[in-house]
């Protein structure tokens, strides 16, 4: 039972027999909580259960939770590979009680597992308790029979857990394993506790209080249990290892890396092998859970992890992308426990391969500069932070890679000067923006925003309203009037016109008043929330304080609403068909079309597109109500609203819900699609009419785009397609239904004619028909006692040239055959064949190279009995053949 997979199974089965529900690991991207970078503990998926927001039928659970700690306060990245127990990715084994059992049973379960199931000797175990937790102290004595000296009271916060400033909290009890007195270090609570002799293997959290305010706690009516045991740590103990990287799982990965790179697992590159093994796990699992490398948020953390591993791959001598070639080894070791790894294997490989291919250029350039700038430094010196910033800012070389590259030489980086350079660059960027060509205009808008405040938007409820002109702007300057025929901008006290944002185009329409009319051609948002209406005065003269009737183009707005709602449905349908990794990267919501950009590594098949379209249209046909409501941001997250990590949200957000769903989240029923969105939408899904996907393409590496039509534009497109089909069917003298069969028959007929034509060309190439052609004598001449068949032909492909040369060799019996084909664009291709009895005298490769030179080409390749080449000048085909004859005769 000492293997990692066996230990994991034994843990889960042990608690399963005790009435615990074995719950699958939650994703590394926490559901409905964009404030948390990654899942970093087993209790994360049960947070709402512990706080009482969510109810569970089973009050006991056990998990093996995949975790990542590589961002924010939980950042182990710099230490990974250089210590025995630091990891970016790890598995947290845990058992949980939600108001069911408490300390006594938790301690009993833990002690029996590690001593009876795992067989750890009692004399090598000790525990800690919170200094004030007399109950836990007494229970350890009673259940485990431990002496007082093996139950250590810890007065610090290390043994008291809190979820936050308020909420559930309670004392902890940690179980430690003694690796032996041959390893430096003292027990917890001693001055030598930071040594490696005593290692924590399990933490039991006793949630028994509700913290109202700092220092003010009330007992919870139903105390709970949350425990966490690092799988890698307990595996090391059970396998008799002091170092996590020596366990079977890591050793299997390290062997795979060593086989590819030739590195010695115990040699000077030991740390690099460990870095790659750890980072391969973190990168692969993050990609499987939908995170892709980018320059922000979770994607940036992933990119840092990947690039650090790639840097160490180069240290091992890898000259080609390495990590993607190791995914199979990880899937072999962990795929059974985590099926999502198996499903995502192709995407993981492709993502790693593309990222490493791109990064190698950055890495090579950065390392050259780094070597130049640090060549005079010696161990203990400090590398200039300004130069480190230049590497980062100009060459895209991350700071942590600079630190990592210098670490082996004992050189540190001046972080203070790096930070100063970063701050100066940001200040310079702000100043540069202030001096841009839009300065005057932007200054006007910020001034008006400060003077007038935010524009009140009425467009969610109405498309017609009354407003008063608050300001007029022309050519970037505030003006007192706009005359008929003049173009300018109007700012109002309130407006039903939607301003372009979130991918949705701005509204158009008209504004009318006493003797005046203004045509709105565009609506923009300036200075964050100032609505600016651009257009032309069609009648009269506009002045501030003019009262106007504001009318949005209803037909256009209706089409835009349909397209925006359709993007939400397509987003969810894409997730259902392609996977949960789908995340929006951009969109366009216009009157006549929509496009939606999203994270995905490969083209979408026609079948997948049809499934996406069908799923979205099913929701359209259900004609469900579309609800939009303002909610507190925390409530919106609890309701399952999709929120992009890195987006900044205010205290109140707008939640758009579409379609029915049987899923429940606490007391909130989720819709089929639930997103945070500030755009305008249809009232019922049926108002969309029809969704028709018209195209799919790549936008950037790892980003795909679908384009679609809705409503009347989709109908018009469908009608046009029907008209085209009818016209085509008429031209083919068949019906639309029979057109595929008719086209297939025509294609078969065409292929047959093409084959017949190719055969005719081959016969011509070999000298036409007749007996001479049949025995291979047509066009044959003797050169230096050797039969030579040399012909220039047209309209024959290179593959057919090869078959003709093979045929000619058989017919000649003994000789050399050379055929040159000239293509439509004037290029020449040549194939030379030599019969077996002559290859000792003539090499087809040598002969074809001489011909290639005449055609303007270089080289040529093949075998002594068959070779091919080409050149740009097919007009010299005969000269090329003469060169071969000369070589044979010479």
UniProtKB/Swiss-Prot annotation:
Predominant location: cytoplasm
Enzyme class, first EC level, given as a word: ligase
GO biological process: alanyl-tRNA aminoacylation; negative regulation of DNA-templated transcription
Catalyzed reactions: tRNA(Ala) + L-alanine + ATP = L-alanyl-tRNA(Ala) + AMP + diphosphate
Any single GO CC term annotated in Swiss-Prot or TrEMBL for this entry: cytosol
Source superkingdom: Bacteria
Keyword Zinc among UniProt keywords: yes
Location of the protein in the cell: Cytoplasm
UniProt-listed CDD domains: AlaRS_core (cd00673)
Cofactor(s) in the UniProt record: Zn(2+)
Classification via SMART domains: tRNA_SAD (SM00863)
Keyword Protein biosynthesis included in the entry's annotation: yes
EC nos: 6.1.1.7
Sorted UniProt keywords: Aminoacyl-tRNA synthetase, ATP-binding, Cytoplasm, Ligase, Metal-binding, Nucleotide-binding, Protein biosynthesis, RNA-binding, tRNA-binding, Zinc
GO MF entry, a single one: aminoacyl-tRNA deacylase activity
UniProt remark on cofactor binding: Binds 1 zinc ion per subunit.
InterPro entries: aa-tRNA-synth_II/BPL/LPL (IPR045864), Ala-tRNA-lgiase_IIc (IPR002318), Ala-tRNA-ligase_IIc_anticod-bd (IPR018162), Ala-tRNA-synth_IIc_core (IPR018165), Ala-tRNA-synth_IIc_N (IPR018164), Ala-tRNA_ligase (IPR050058), Ala_tRNA_ligase_euk/bac (IPR023033), DHHA1_dom (IPR003156)
Alphabetized NCBIfam families for the sequence: alaS (TIGR00344)
Function: Catalyzes the attachment of alanine to tRNA(Ala) in a two-step reaction: alanine is first activated by ATP to form Ala-AMP and then transferred to the acceptor end of tRNA(Ala). Also edits incorrectly charged Ser-tRNA(Ala) and Gly-tRNA(Ala) via its editing domain.
Family recorded in the similarity comment: Belongs to the class-II aminoacyl-tRNA synthetase family.
HAMAP family: Ala_tRNA_synth_B (MF_00036_B)
Identification of the protein by name: Alanine--tRNA ligase
Gene that encodes it: alaS
